């Protein structure tokens, strides 16, 4: 049995929550969530390989203890091979897929270690596939700057700690290494920007991770902002949902009018932006994650790609009018994960 090792830096909740859901549990026998630090703490390829085999052994025991989840014979073979390789890895890692998620949350040192781990995996004598290879995958600043340079986005992004200043206003501030959204109100001019940056500096929060982002207004004629979400899992791209809000910084849906819910349902069934999304994921060299974006007159505005996204929504939201959307998306996610192995 091939496994999917899902590496995270900060929050293991998104993938674990999905695997505990009624639909996501179909993939639980194959997916092994674990923290980067489990590998980073090991010295050299042999010790790293042994750590991977240790988790393969744990997963095999768990699957054998739940005989109705997967065929017994496959898990017994995985257990036997894992125990053997644990004592003598000999250049082998467990066969399967290694997903480097949470890349945007890694420190500079963490990125360096992730690149080293990726190189070790690439030299494995086993059949190993790497998603979000940290030696290739673009992080937020590089992605947004590339999308602007390519004419896909109409807004640019800047690093104030490197002396970069915006060419147009309004702008807002955000951190590059999290998904909490804006850390400022809309800033209308250079004087307001200088004041906002000075406040951050005085609080000790003006770091190299702070970005200046030009504001792009995507509200419709009714003042409603629609934030689309779509997943990439290996070679598959599929919609997640649309969040509607009157707030320009849209994190979750605040509006549930019937016509908006119908628009969301149509979106997840038809995936109208499929070709463009595939192009953007390929451009960023991102194999696993969720893109957040809006549409204006047929043109896309990409806000970010989260490499450790929420998959299963809160239990209270899984009922009512949006339940068909969540069920469909989770079924597609489970199918996409199975297709990896």
Outline where the language-model segments fall:
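ATP-grasp fold ATP-binding core
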Residues: 165-183, 205-222
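Short, surface-exposed charged micro-motifs
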Residues: 229, 290-292
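Short N-terminal binding/cap micro-motifs at the start of the first secondary-structure element
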Residues: 11-20
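C-terminal active-site "lid" helix and adjoining low-complexity regulatory extension at the edge
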Residues: 286, 295-341
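Extreme N-terminal starter segment of soluble prokaryotic enzymes
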Residues: 1-5
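Phosphate-binding site of ATP-dependent enzymes
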Residues: 190-269, 274
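Protein kinase-like catalytic core scaffold
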Residues: 171, 211, 238, 289, ...
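Conserved N-proximal alpha/beta basic substrate-recognition cap immediately N-terminal to
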Residues: 21, 37-168
């Amino acid at each position: 049995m091939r496994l999917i090792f899902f590496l995270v830096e900060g929050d293991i909740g998104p993938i674990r929550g999905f695997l505990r859901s009624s639909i996501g549990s179909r993939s639980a026998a194959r997916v092994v969530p674990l923290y980067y630090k489990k590998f980073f703490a090991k010295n050299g390829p042999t010790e790293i390989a042994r750590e991977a085999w240790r988790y393969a052994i744990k997963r095999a025991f768990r699957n054998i203890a739940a005989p109705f989840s997967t065929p017994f014979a496959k898990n017994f073979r995985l257990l036997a091979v894992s125990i053997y390789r644990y004592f003598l890895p000999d250049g082998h890692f467990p066969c399967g897929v290694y997903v480097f998620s949470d890349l945007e949350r890694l420190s500079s040192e963490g990125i360096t270690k992730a690149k080293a781990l990726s190189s070790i995996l690439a030299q494995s004598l086993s059949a190993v596939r790497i998603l979000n290879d940290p030696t290739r995958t673009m992080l937020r600043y590089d992605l947004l700057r590339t999308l602007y340079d390519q004419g896909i986005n109409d807004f640019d992004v800047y690093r104030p700690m490197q002396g970069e200043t915006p060419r147009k206003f309004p702008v807002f501030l955000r951190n590059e290494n999290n998904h909490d959204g804006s850390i400022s109100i809309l800033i209308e001019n250079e004087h307001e920007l200088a004041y906002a940056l000075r406040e951050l500096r005085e609080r000790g929060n003006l770091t190299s991770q702070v970005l200046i982002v030009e504001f792009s207004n995507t509200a419709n004629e009714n003042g409603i902002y629609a934030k689309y979400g779509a997943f990439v899992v290996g070679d598959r791209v599929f919609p997640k949902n649309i969040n509607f809000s009157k707030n320009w910084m849209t994190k979750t849906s605040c509006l549930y009018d019937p016509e908006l819910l119908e628009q969301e349902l149509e979106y997840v069934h038809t995936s109208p932006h499929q070709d463009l999304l595939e192009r953007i994921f390929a451009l960023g060299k991102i194999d696993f994650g969720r893109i957040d974006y809006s549409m204006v007159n047929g043109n896309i505005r990409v806000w970010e790609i989260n490499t450790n996204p929420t998959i299963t929504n809160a239990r209270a939201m899984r009922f009512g009018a949006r339940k068909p959307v969540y069920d469909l998306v989770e079924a597609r996610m489970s199918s996409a994960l199975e297709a990896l192995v």
